[in-house]
Amino acid sequence: MDGENHSVVSEFLFLGLTHSWEIQLLLLVFSSVLYVASITGNILIVFSVTTDPHLHSPMYFLLASLSFIDLGACSVTSPKMIYDLFRKRKVISFGGCIAQIFFIHVVGGVEMVLLIAMAFDRYVALCKPLHYLTIMSPRMCLSFLAVAWTLGVSHSLFQLAFLVNLAFCGPNVLDSFYCDLPRLLRLACTDTYRLQFMVTVNSGFICVGTFFILLISYVFILFTVWKHSSGGSSKALSTLSAHSTVVLLFFGPPMFVYTRPHPNSQMDKFLAIFDAVLTPFLNPVVYTFRNKEMKAAIKRVCKQLVIYKRIS
């Protein structure tokens, strides 16, 4: 009956990050620089791994896959956020909102599985080096990638299944700069308390569960290497430091958002910026630019590009 008294929502209005002109200018510069750096860094990694024979190994295949996903991660919400910074009316269509939610959860799901695959790769390399190439065969790497995409898409469709049949008849204001599923559910015309709980439990359980799987695997790797090598402890710590740093950067913000009992709008926005802009930029820095082989490969790629530009 209430639906007859309201028009169906066809677009959503973002409140954005801040109304301060100075902070908006700072965010514009900060976000634009990091976005361009993220795109450039991750493309360089994918291109280097694809073209350089020295990097045709399971570890770099997984790194390139992660960089490809990070290209999506920084492109789902960042361009729209940058475009809207100085706009008075920040709107997104209903279809655009659904698309944002879909790709956010696909990217998140795929990246979680890839991080588990990379932890397994490091376990085999450190604990079973003689069997590394046998276990981490091309077939195994492709299987990891197929599972990652299957689970990522399945998780996203599962989340959207809660949403597509809901009626939105007003209000249409989201206190954010992107379409966040928990906030969007609160705008539905019907009572969505149970639905919000299920979505939070689903995302929170996946984040926390994957994080603890990775944590346990790292502890097991450290213990195994320390046990079988006199200098194993420091070697393992050095090898796993990059992986654990990226895991903390990736899982920290969503775990904080989905597991705390009392949401805070400003804190959520800060964490969302961190997750959307900073994490995809830091991943290539932490994972690969500290790697001598990767740095050498990127230098070779850059030299080839310079030579090609001069010739053309």
Swiss-Prot record:
Record's keyword annotation contains Transmembrane: yes
Topology with respect to the bilayer: Multi-pass membrane protein
SUPFAM superfamilies registered for this protein in UniProt: Family A G protein-coupled receptor-like (SSF81321)
Positions on the Extracellular side per record topology: 1-25, 80-100, 159-195, 259-269
An example molecular function term from Gene Ontology annotations: G protein-coupled receptor activity
Major place of residence: membrane
Function: Odorant receptor.
Protein name: Olfactory receptor 4F3/4F16/4F29
Source organism per UniProt: Homo sapiens (Human)
